[in-house]
UniProtKB/Swiss-Prot annotation:
It comes from the Bacteria. Exhibits S-adenosyl-L-methionine-dependent methyltransferase activity. It comes from Mycobacteroides abscessus (strain ATCC 19977 / DSM 44196 / CCUG 20993 / CIP 104536 / JCM 13569 / NCTC 13031 / TMC 1543 / L948) (Mycobacterium abscessus). This is Putative S-adenosyl-L-methionine-dependent methyltransferase MAB_0213c. It holds the Pfam family LCM. GO terms for biological process: methylation.
Length: 303
């Protein structure tokens, strides 16, 4: 059961979803050349051990993420989502932005994977135990970031703007913000507070990218959650875990909210992006299709 003050490490609650995402990224491939979408993701799964290590080594053929339906569509989802946000940062870097903020960064390794312009600073905010696991794993493999990296241990439901600025962030300069896989883990009121804080810290010329999921009708949400729990393997199911952890509340639509505060915002359905960008689509009405059709990608620039 979620509470307003719950905390987690990498193996529990919301933290465990970071490992599921890492597993999806480890299994995901670029559609153009078959290269791994995130070469660091497998390191985290192996470090976590158990099902995650077995999964990326091909030792768990009965795992949900190994299935042809949900597992394949989840990996393709991770490939598409990762590429979308990678492209966002390429674009914002080209405009001269040199401050990047990753909210609920989890096991995101863009500070290592992407080629950043000189003097780019990347601020990564997440729970302390998640940050600890990430840092220890990267250090164990001698990984070196390609930007000036600032890992910040903080709960985003608390006052994180102060510690961000104390860590070197300058609100008078343009910045690029990423809100990936986060909003549905927040209550609607916490989402509004998060967006308000970003808006207050973002100078004109700043950019933001947001993953937004539409809210399920209440009856559909309860049916989906029950069905996912009933079909889960003994070790758990990423879909069942996800549905048990999110807040399925009516909430502000990010693009509309941002436009109301002077941002020029665009929104695209993830399935449309996948279709036009060469990513494999899940079969219509499959579990994968029904999961992804609620996901939208929002980008905005502050005037």
């Amino acid at each position: 059961m979620r509470t307003d003050t719950d905390t987690w490490d990498i193996q529990t609650s919301v933290g465990s979803t970071a490992l599921a995402v890492a597993a999806g990224r480890a299994l995901a491939r670029h559609p153009a050349n078959g290269a791994p979408i995130d070469p660091y993701a497998e390191l985290f799964c192996r470090a976590a051990g158990g099902q995650w290590s077995d999964l990326v080594q091909g030792k768990q053929s009965d795992h949900a993420l190994s299935s042809e339906d949900f597992g394949r569509s989840f990996a393709n989802f991770q490939a598409a989502r990762t590429a979308f946000f990678d492209n966002f940062f390429t674009t914002t870097s080209d405009t001269g932005v040199r401050q990047v903020v990753l909210l609920a960064s989890g096991l995101d390794c863009r500070a290592y994977r992407l080629q950043w312009p000189a003097e780019t600073e990347v601020y990564e905010l997440d729970q302390p135990l998640v940050q600890q696991f990430k840092q220890e794993t990267l250090d164990a493999h001698g990984a070196a970031p390609s930007a000036v990296r600032h890992p910040i241990s903080v709960d985003l439901r608390q006052d994180w703007s102060t510690i961000l600025q104390e860590s070197g962030f300058d609100p008078s300069r343009p910045s690029a913000w990423l809100v990936e896989g986060l909003l549905f883990f927040l209550k609607s009121s916490a989402q509004d507070l998060l967006l308000e804080t970003i808006d207050s810290l973002a100078a004109p010329g700043s950019h933001i990218a947001v993953e937004q999921r539409d809210t399920y009708p209440d009856i559909e949400f309860e049916m989906r959650r029950a069905a996912a729990a009933d079909s889960a393997e003994p070790g758990g199911s990423p879909l069942a875990d996800f549905l048990a952890l999110i807040y399925n509340e009516s909430r502000s639509e990010a693009a509309t909210w941002l436009r109301g505060r002077g941002w020029a915002a665009e929104r695209i359905a993830l399935l449309d992006y996948m279709n036009t960008s060469g990513f494999e689509l899940p079969a219509y009405s499959s579990v994968g299709w029904d999961t992804l059709r609620y996901t939208n990608m929002v980008t905005a620039a502050k005037r």
